[in-house]
Design a protein with these regions (language model features):
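Conserved catalytic or regulatory cores that recognize and/or transform ribose-phosphate-containing ligands
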Residues: 17, 39, 82
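Negatively charged, low-complexity tracts enriched in Asp/Glu with abundant Ser/Thr
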Residues: 1-21
């Protein structure tokens, strides 16, 4: 995966909904190396296709973590909440 946002490398992303126009609603997990250690974030994300074959993404409602296990647990919890709707 070669996706980045706000300095975070997106290391996991799962689509939980797709509109008929191809817009995807996702939960993503990001990682960033800093001088203070590795930081993690989970975001909700909307991704839609562009006419040139690429895609545009927006990221919002971030949950920030300094522990990978907690970030991954948050990632899975957020996905579970979306699938249970």
């Amino acid at each position: 995966m070669n996706e980045r946002n706000e300095g975070y490398e997106i290391i996991a992303a799962e689509t939980y909904s797709t509109s008929r126009l191809g817009q995807e609603s996702r939960i993503v997990l990001g990682r960033m190396e800093t001088k203070h250690g590795t930081m993690f974030v989970t975001w909700e994300s909307t991704r839609w296709p562009l006419s040139d074959g690429g895609a545009k993404s927006d990221y919002y409602w971030g949950h920030y973590h300094d522990d990978e296990a907690k970030a991954r647990a948050d990632y899975h919890r957020r996905l579970t909440e979306k699938y249970e709707r």
